[in-house]
C-alpha cells in the first residue's frame, strides 16, 4: 500500500532503542486519546486502539494505567497534536506527526532535522493533495476467508485489505475509524496497531542510493521524542 513507517519496519525497530523510546511515545498516544475522548476504553475507540497497540508492544499494564491516570489529572500536561510537511533528499515527500507539550521546542527540532539532513520544511497544506488520510488497522494474520471478511466489514467503512507474510492490514475512510474498529473487534481479530495514517496517492520508487540519503532524515525524525509517526510517498 506504499505507506511509510511500515517500510523498513525491521531495521527501524532495531534502531529505535526499542523500549526506551517506544514506551514514552505509546504512553503519550494513550494520554492524548484519553484526554480527547474520555478515559473509558469501551466508549473511546481511539483509546482502545492505543491501549491495544501498547499491549502488542509489551508495554506493562502499570505504564498503560499511569498514562490514562495522567490524562484525567487536573495538572495533566497539555499535549497537542502537531503536523509538519516537508521534502527529503531527491524530492521524497514527508509528513511528520508529533505530540508535544512544547510546540516551540518541537518545531525548532523538526526544522533543524530537515535542514541538517538534506531536506526542507514546507508550508502545511502543501502536500494535502498528495496523500489521503485513512483509518488503518494492522492485525495478526487472518487464517479464514478474506473475501468473507471483506463482506463482513464493508458496512463499517472498510475500503481495502492486504495480507502479507507478517500481518493483515485493513483500511477505510478516516471518518469510519470508530465504526471499523468496533467491527474488527467483533470479528475477534488480534490488533497490533491502529490509527489514522497518511497514504500516498502516487507512491514513488527510489534507488538504493537515493533511499540511503532519504533514510538519514527519516532516522533522525523517528528518533525525536516528540515524533509519533512519519509518512512518505516512498513505494
Curated annotation (Swiss-Prot):
Gene3D superfamilies, A to Z: 1.10.10.200, 3.30.70.980
Q: Which Pfam families match?
A: TACO1_YebC_N (PF20772), Transcrip_reg (PF01709)
For this UniProt entry, the molecular function terms from Gene Ontology, in alphabetical order, are: DNA binding
Disulfide links within the chain:
none
Q: What is the predominant subcellular site recorded for this chain? A: cytoplasm
Q: Which residues form a coiled coil?
A: none
* Protein's cellular compartments: Cytoplasm
Q: Name one GO cellular component term.
A: cytosol
User: Would the keyword Transmembrane helix turn up in this protein's UniProt record?
Assistant: no
Sorted keywords for this record are: Cytoplasm, DNA-binding, Transcription, Transcription regulation
* One record GO biological process: regulation of DNA-templated transcription
**Stored NCBIfam families:** PRK12378.1, YebC/PmpR family DNA-binding transcriptional regulator
Could you say which protein family the record assigns here? Belongs to the TACO1 family.
- Which protein is depicted? Probable transcriptional regulatory protein JJD26997_0557
Please name the taxonomic classification of the source: Bacteria, Pseudomonadati, Campylobacterota, Epsilonproteobacteria, Campylobacterales
Amino acid at each position: 500500500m506504499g505507506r511509510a513507517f511500515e517500510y523498513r519496519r525491521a531495521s527501524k525497530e532495531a534502531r529505535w532503542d526499542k523500549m526506551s523510546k517506544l514506551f514514552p511515545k505509546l504512553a503519550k498516544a494513550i494520554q492524548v486519546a484519553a484526554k480527547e475522548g474520555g478515559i473509558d476504553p469501551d466508549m473511546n475507540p481511539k483509546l482502545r486502539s492505543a491501549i491495544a497497540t501498547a499491549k502488542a508492544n509489551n508495554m506493562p499494564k502499570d505504564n498503560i494505567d499511569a498514562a490514562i491516570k495522567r490524562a484525567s489529572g487536573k495538572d495533566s500536561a497539555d499535549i497537542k497534536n502537531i503536523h509538519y510537511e516537508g521534502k527529503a533528499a531527491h524530492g521524497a515527500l514527508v509528513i511528520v506527526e508529533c505530540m508535544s507539550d512544547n510546540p516551540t521546542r518541537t518545531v525548532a527540532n523538526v526544522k533543524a532535522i530537515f535542514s541538517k539532513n538534506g531536506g526542507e520544511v514546507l508550508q502545511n497544506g502543501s502536500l494535502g493533495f498528495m496523500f489521503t488520510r485513512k483509518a488503518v488497522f494492522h492485525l495478526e494474520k487472518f487464517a479464514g476467508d478474506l473475501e468473507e471478511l471483506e463482506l463482513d466489514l464493508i458496512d463499517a467503512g472498510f475500503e481495502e485489505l492486504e495480507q502479507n507474510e507478517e500481518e493483515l492490514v485493513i483500511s477505510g475512510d478516516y471518518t469510519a475509524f470508530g465504526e471499523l474498529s468496533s467491527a474488527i473487534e467483533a470479528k475477534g481479530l488480534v490488533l497490533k496497531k491502529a490509527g489514522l495514517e497518511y497514504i500516498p496517492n502516487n507512491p514513488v520508487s527510489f534507488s538504493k542510493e537515493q533511499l540511503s540519503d532519504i533514510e538519514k532524515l527519516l532516522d533522525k525524525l523517528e528518533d525525536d521524542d516528540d515524533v509519533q509517526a512519519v509518512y512518505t510517498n516512498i513505494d
